[in-house]
Amino acid sequence: MIKRVLVVSMVGLSLVGCVNNDTLSGDVYTASEAKQVQNVSYGTIVNVRPVQIQGGDDSNVIGAIGGAVLGGFLGNTVGGGTGRSLATAAGAVAGGVAGQGVQSAMNKTQGVELEIRKDDGNTIMVVQKQGNTRFSPGQRVVLASNGSQVTVSPR
């Protein structure tokens, strides 16, 4: 029984690692963005600042639930009678807290905040994932916009 739970838990944790955060980068386009007309403008990088991008929603409880189930199961294997019940409850609480912490850490990615002075004189701020491209102040860039999202690339 323990082997089955551990195998299911490991498979679940492995699948969580398959999340693709690369779409936050200026180097990657989603399938729906391909072959779409985008407005293009040009500008110059004024300032670059490293940031962290927190993906997902803090109220997302999948990690907490998974951790609570696993913690409760492991706690249930300890002791007998009242001690087993207390160990199950403590394991579920500790597992829930640990699971939520793991999920939160997995949802973070390194990003870059770009302050850009466009050629029309307006200054904008864009945050995107730090991809292969490294930006620096004074660098010329191209901005591709579909109306709701902007992608910054070197010119």
Curated annotation (Swiss-Prot):
Q: Lipidation, kind N-palmitoyl cysteine: residue numbers?
A: 18
Q: Which positions are tagged coiled coil?
A: none
Lipidated residues (S-diacylglycerol cysteine)? 18
Localized where? Cell outer membrane
Name the membrane topology term: Lipid-anchor
Which InterPro entries does the record associate with it? Answer: Bact_OM_lipoprot/Surf_antigen, Gly_zipper_2TM_dom
Q: Identify the Pfam families for this entry.
A: Rick_17kDa_Anti (PF05433)
Q: Which GO terms describe its cellular component?
A: cell outer membrane
Induction description: Induced by low extracellular levels of magnesium via the PhoQ/PhoP two-component regulatory system.
Q: What is its main location?
A: membrane
What is the annotated signal peptide range for this record? 1-17
Q: What UniProt keywords apply to this chain's record, in alphabetical order?
A: Cell outer membrane, Lipoprotein, Membrane, Palmitate, Signal
Q: Which family does it belong to?
A: Belongs to the Pcp/SlyB lipoprotein family.
The name of this protein is Outer membrane lipoprotein SlyB
* Species name: Escherichia coli (strain K12)
| Encoding gene (name) | slyB
